Amino acid sequence: MKFIDRVKIHVKAGDGGRGCLSFRREKFIPKGGPDGGDGGRGGNIVLRVDEGLGTLLDLRYQIHYKAQRGAHGMGKNCHGKNGEDLEIRVPPGVLVYDAETDELLADLTEGCHELVVVRGGMGGRGNARFATSTNRAPRHVQPGVEGEERWLRLELKLLADVGLLGMPNAGKSTLISAVSAARPKIADYPFTTLVPNLGVVRCGGFKTFVMADIPGLIEGASEGHGLGTRFLRHVERTDLFLHLVDLSDLQEGDPMERFALINRELARHNPELMEKPQLVVLSKIDVSEVRERLDAVRAAFAAEGIRTLAISAVTGEGLKELVAEVARELEKLRASRLQADQKAAEEDEPWQPDLS
């Protein structure tokens, strides 16, 4: 399936139905009076989260969406039927912007599962509504109000617990395929991964976490080099970064420098990303040359106060320890977040006098 994470669509709510001009016509009632009904309300357009979707592909090929208009009013005081709402299903994690003003309308995550983006117009009033003591036969009716319309820009940010960082060919796709059921394309050339991939990792019992693999970063990515930072927004929601450093390619320079380079590009894209905790993972330790220099590299990171984990996604060495460490870190982060939320809730409680 093609991965689409940004689309622009036009939405038009339904117009309200027109009020009816009608007079009561019955035998033996020569002056029955007005009986024109009101028009129906136009339908709204609603964005609704569908947990089964993971891309905006369906919206790529249909740009214009129009809800049903309200039915016109009828005689005998019959009101027109309201137009049906039109639902547009989107994956969780979509940011909804007004395309003309760039205003953020909503973030459709777990806390917000639907959003009315445009509302239908009200139906017009029939002539029965305008009858007065001095005007027994009004011939005035109201047209329906036009429904709202606007251009929207939808941007998808994947929802994941752990994001994988690293240069191209660092082994990110191999890692996610080794610890989950995800099957991204894997090859021995840079930029094999062209779109983000998600994988669900089981860490014992019923506990799981979601890992996101994005295309690798290179120097100048914040300026658009390589694949740029287009896909970095997909790891902005993650709680933890796994920063993979490939030790097998000696031509790429010092591992510490490559580690710092990725962090510089990350900071240029969004300084807030640097506040997220990182676990540094030294990859491809199954290669003999890597074994020889592994201790020296770990010592260099340790001198900077950076703890490292060593793995081989091919042989499986170190993967069990890595998954366990990630699970522990996520548990700590969730516990601290829960504690902060409880503290904030206690501070928001209104003061009450002690009556004891």
Swiss-Prot record:
It is an enzyme of class 3 (hydrolase). Residues 1-159 form the Obg domain. Belongs to the TRAFAC class OBG-HflX-like GTPase superfamily. OBG GTPase family. This is GTPase Obg. InterPro entries: G_OBG, GTP-bd, GTP-bd_Obg/CgtA, GTP1-OBG_CS, GTP1_OBG_dom, GTP1_OBG_dom_sf, OBG_GTPase, P-loop_NTPase. GO terms for molecular function: GTP binding; GTPase activity; magnesium ion binding. One of its GO terms (cellular component) is cytoplasm. Its cofactor is Mg(2+). Monomer. Its EC number is 3.6.5.-. An essential GTPase which binds GTP, GDP and possibly (p)ppGpp with moderate affinity, with high nucleotide exchange rates and a fairly low GTP hydrolysis rate. Plays a role in control of the cell cycle, stress response, ribosome biogenesis and in those bacteria that undergo differentiation, in morphogenesis control. It comes from Syntrophotalea carbinolica (strain DSM 2380 / NBRC 103641 / GraBd1) (Pelobacter carbinolicus).
